[in-house]
Every structure is written in C-alpha cells, then in structure tokens.
Amino acid sequence: MAESPAVSIVVVLYNSAGCIGPCISSLASLEYRPFELIMVDNASSDDSAVLARGCAQKDGLDCLVSRLGRNRGFAAATNHGILLSGGEVILLLNPDAEVYPDTLGALVEALREPEVGIAGCKVYYPDRETLQHAGGFIRDNGLTWHYGVNEKDVGQYDEPADVSYVTGAALALKREVLDRVGPLDAGYFPAYFEETDLCLRARRAGYRVVYAPRARLVHHESVTVGKFTERYYYLYHRNRIRFMLKNYSWRFLLDRALPFEQRWLSMIEPEEQAIPLNKAYLVNILNLPRTLAARRRADKILSAPRIEDTVSEL
C-alpha cells in the first residue's frame, strides 16, 4: 500500500435529506488527505442528491453524485459507487453517520498491515458516550451481535482486535480485497448482511478483519428502514438465513445452526417476530435455487475451507 494511499469514500443515499448534511460536514473536517467523495442516490423520493451536492459545495468538498433510476439496494448501489472510484482504499459510509477528524487516518493506519483487508470503527450512539459497535461476532444460527452495544465507553474496548465482521455503517477496505473476493452481494436486497458476507469472504481468502478503536464514528441508526419494525425483522431474518445457506457447510447447518435456531426460537417472544420469521423461512425456500447458485459462485472464487467460528452461547 502507498505511503499515503488515495481513499474513495462511497456513500449511498436513500431518502437521506434529513441526515446527509451533518455527515458531509464531518467529512469536511477529516484530517487525512487525499480522498474523493462519491455519493450514489438510490432513487430517493426526496431531494437527497441535490441537498448532498449543495452541502458538499458549502463545505468545500469535491463530490461526484450519481443518481440511479431505481432503488437497487445497498449492495448494488455501493458496487456502482466503487466502480466510479479510483482509491486504493475504499471507505463505505452510511449517510446517517458522522466521522471524527482522525477517523480516516486511523482506518488507513489499521490497513497498513499486509494481512489486514478490512477495518471498522468504534461506533457511538448520538450521545457520543454509549457504544453501538466495537466489532461484531456471529452466533451459530447467523444472528449478529455487536461487542460493547449499549455500554458506556470507559476504555474497555480501546485495544485493536480481530473480529468476525465490522458494521457497514463505516467499513474501510483495500481495493485488492474486492479484486480477490468479488463485489458486495446484491442478493441481500435491499439491505442487511451484505457487509457480514463480505467480511466472511475476505477472511476465507486469508485477510484479517479488524476493529480499529482509534477510528470513531457516531451513527444515527436505521434512519431509512426503521429499527425493530416488522419490515426490519423480515429483512434481517430473510438475509440471515440466506447468509447461512450461502456460506456454511451442510454439516454445520444440521449439527449447529438448526439446533441453535430451535433453542433461540424457544426463548423469544413469538408475537414479536412470528410473522416476519415465517415469511423469511418461506421466501428462503422459494429462493433456494438462486441462493445455491450464489454459493457455487463464491466457492468457485474461494477454494479455501469455510470459516465457521461462530459463538454457541445465547
């Protein structure tokens, strides 16, 4: 990697007019240079693209805004932005996120180690004291969880660490990772699990995924989809199941994932998630041929053994 690699920051907009201003203002405060800013508008029904361009001009940032004719989902829109970019390092950033001045420099520094392919941030809720994410892990049935979530930050996550995945709210990676493992999987339409899938494929290819605590971020979570709505549960569980079917061995699915799923189902409130869960199971059955095709494509690119270092405790 170059001494001061060029960075491409890719932000996908979808009805983001209410949050993109603070995001762009925070990018203007970044100490690291050079970087380019690319924004992809995913057929927003508001004036996200116009507002984003205006905010960038006001803050003195050069910005390329590309408008898609239809909502292609987060992964496909991100891939479109990456195709327009030229940086050796790529930062995928949500429009409802605000970086600290030294965030980008800390991410680039974490990526300097040759074996590190992806780096993620210490993510705060808007109070800037409560942690939202300090790296992530995956349970046996594909449930994702954030280290540190809802904990006050008192320095307990100040050491860098290798993790299973980092949140797509702010994910930095070397371009060579995408050259090796392929783009984000647009099959996770419209959102959820595309970054988890990318991190798993990168690890399978021999790269490390690291949590870089000096890179800090504020994330106003789920402005677009809404957190803990029926739609959220459906999309999350549909893509969780697809993630498992695509990436894990059949023995793992039978011996660990299925028993864990049964145990987890016995512990949750059925009225809260029953309808979206049943719908998610059904849709995955109907979509199984396409998921198996995606599995075969991934296996063709990645001949290394599957990574199944999940957590067995609820």
Regions found by a protein language model. Give the residues of each.
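Short, flexible, basic/aromatic active-site loop/helix in glycosyltransferases
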Residues: 139-164
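Short, acidic, metal-binding catalytic loop of nucleotide-sugar glycosyltransferases
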Residues: 25-34
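Glycine-rich, basic loop-to-helix element that forms the pyrophosphate-binding segment
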Residues: 67-85, 95
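A conserved acidic beta->alpha catalytic loop
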Residues: 26, 41-50, 70
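A short, conserved alpha-helix in the catalytic core of glycosyltransferases
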Residues: 164-218
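Conserved donor NDP-sugar-binding/catalytic core segment of glycosyltransferases
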Residues: 97-139
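Short aromatic/hydrophobic "clamp" motif used to bind/position activated sugar donors
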Residues: 90
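Active-site-adjacent helix/loop segment of glycosyltransferases
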Residues: 208-309
